[in-house]
C-alpha cells in the first residue's frame, strides 16, 4: 500500500507546480454555518480556524500534489506489471481508508459523516471482467473488498461475512448491488464520553 496522501504532505516540487495556489479553488462557507450543524459534526481545531486564505490554498495545493505524486507511483506499479507480463494475472484494488475534508463545510482532515470524509474512491481491475474501465452507481462498502477478492480468486466466499462479492458489479456495472451502506465514526475518548455516530446511505 501507499502512505500518501497523508500529512505531512510531502511530494517533489514538480507536483506542487501543477497547482498554483492562487488558482486552487477554495470552498465557500455560508455565514454562521457552524450554527446550523450539530456540534458533534464539527472536527475543526483552533489552529485550523485561524488559517488565512493563502494558507488554506497552500494546504489544498499540497494535498493535490501528494495525490498526484501517489498516482505517479501507482503508474510505476502498473508499468512493472505490464513489463513483467503479469497484468492479466493480477487483481488491482485502489481505495482509501477514509475520505478527507479540504475546507468543505469549513472542516479539514477526516472523521465526519459528511460525504467528503465518509465516501472513498474504489477502483478494482480484475482479469476477465466485462465491465473493465466502466464506473457504477451501485452502493458498495469496504467490507465488500475481502469477499470480492476471495470470489475473484476462485474460492468459496464464507457465509458468515457481512460484505458481499462485487464480482457481479465488475462484470455488469448496471448490477443493482446492495440497498444501503453504513458509516460510523467515534467522538470523545480520554475523560470525555465516547459517542458513536452513524449514517446510512
Language-model region placement:
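C-terminal cap/loop subdomain of S1 sulfatases and analogous C-terminal strand-loop tails that border
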Residues: 98-104, 143-146, 151-201
